[in-house]
């Protein structure tokens, strides 16, 4: 339909009408359906994977919620009432984004979805292999740049972020233009976990996010010319449970060789365990919680009903506080976690204390 015959006033109203036509505001107040415009000095970036545990989160800290579960309008309304953004998940096959027309269509769909759901941006979570000399290398950077331009043009105050591995050194065969992507979006969420996804040395259980190894990743990003203010540290609220082929007297747990993207061993030999499960298991374990000084991380050993020894590595308030201190001391943009649903939000007194301590660990110690 041609627009040339419409009065100028009507043309000015079109963006508003388009937003309203996406559906009436589900919040108690229409103002809560407006995008968040405030840019906090410090980000606390929370991944939520669904259900209603968000009602018990520490909203005094949260600045952004990446909604990776089913869309929940109640969450959006509540987050906005607390001044926090709620952003979409963005995932797409890299083979498709080589085509500029396909990119434009995908971006337009995401913008429309964000508008319809009164959301504040998008978190692009790709995590796919990219060869440095492939067309996907440049196309990925273009995708981020074009996504940022579209969202910021269409939704005032919107935020576009991109998830990267714990190190820029081609982890899991991901060769990305990190400096170009950082320049093209608001900030990078650095996934400082799953750091045993490629084990090149001994095939043994180790920390999900060893302290020194984690910090080396940030040093390498900054050496590339990426500003610390473009980096948000992601910490794990889960651990890995490994079956030990052999458990030595020194607590060395030899694990099954499971190759991953070229590496002979990986954390795929274990399985992920949320913090709430770990807390219920650790005190009844064979060893109780132990602290590894080299990796600055806790672990414990237990025996399953079949008589096999397991070793569980995880992060707790002690290990997370160390990393949060680095965030503060080196001026990073903020901190966040995968994922907020991993804690126990029940009415149990001990669980409540443990959950409060994990949220509290995100606050950098001065």
From Swiss-Prot:
Q: Gene3D superfamilies from the entry?
A: 3.10.50.10, Glycosidases (3.20.20.80)
Q: Report the Pfam families cross-referenced here.
A: Glyco_hydro_18
Q: What is its EC number?
A: 3.2.1.-
Q: Which CDD domains match?
A: GH18_chitobiase
Domain of life, source organism: Eukaryota
Q: Which residues are glycosylated?
A: 131, 177, 212, 246, 283
What start and end residues bound the annotated signal peptide?
A: 1-22
Question: Which positions fall inside the GH18 domain?
Answer: 23-366
GO biological process: what's one of them?
chitin catabolic process
Q: Which GO terms describe its molecular function?
A: chitin binding; chitinase activity
What does the entry list under GO cellular component?
A: lysosome
Q: Which residues form the active site?
A: 127
Q: What enzyme class is recorded for this protein?
A: hydrolase
What is the recorded function of this protein according to its Swiss-Prot or TrEMBL entry?
Involved in the degradation of asparagine-linked glycoproteins. Hydrolyze of N-acetyl-beta-D-glucosamine (1-4)N-acetylglucosamine chitobiose core from the reducing end of the bond, it requires prior cleavage by glycosylasparaginase.
Q: What family is this? A: Belongs to the glycosyl hydrolase 18 family.
- State the protein's name: Di-N-acetylchitobiase
